């Protein structure tokens, strides 16, 4: 189908988002065309602002407006425990549960040889450096229960064991192949309470 150039560009831009195929991108593009100009300008500004105003915490890797992030700055947190997660949405899911009081480390991905992603491509080197310099007694590996998450957890466990830090994994109850961000608070709460040593 031939569209005017601005619509084609907008459709292609929407298709760069995860889970957005050609039909959904087309629907979003035409919806954008029907929006009031002020709303479109606000939407475009929000997209630009999220890239310009947010950064990653230099300590844990979580998205933040200020560096270090509010979690790393919170003196009430248990600094002896770090929960390692794959991405920022996992931190948000864990925080919703309101039971975990330790710190986080965001990997921004998982090891996936099929996709050409190795340990050096995600935030593992900074985790190891952090563990050597901080007073951490437990590392909770909260990767997603899928092949990539399990591979990443095993890799980190092998790296951390020689440092002498207790390494635990969330209890199962999270569905295999599922994503942490979609788990409800009760399931997450039980998984953190029943974590097992690796």
UniProtKB/Swiss-Prot annotation:
The Toprim domain, residue ranges: 80-175
Chain ranges of zinc fingers (C4-type): 57-72
Keyword Cell inner membrane on entry: no
One GO-annotated biological process of the protein: DNA repair
Keyword presence, Coiled coil: no
Molecular function, one GO term: zinc ion binding
Keywords annotated in UniProt: DNA damage, DNA recombination, DNA repair, Metal-binding, Zinc, Zinc-finger
Domain of life: Bacteria
InterPro entries: DNA_Rcmb_RecR (IPR000093), Rcmb_RecR (IPR023627), Rcmb_RecR_Znf (IPR015967), TOPRIM_dom (IPR006171), TOPRIM_RecR (IPR034137)
A Pfam cross-reference name: Toprim_4
Family label: Belongs to the RecR family.
Its job: May play a role in DNA repair. It seems to be involved in an RecBC-independent recombinational process of DNA repair. It may act with RecF and RecO.
HAMAP family in alphabetical order: RecR
Protein name, UniProt field: Recombination protein RecR
Phylogenetic lineage: Bacteria, Bacillati, Bacillota, Bacilli, Bacillales
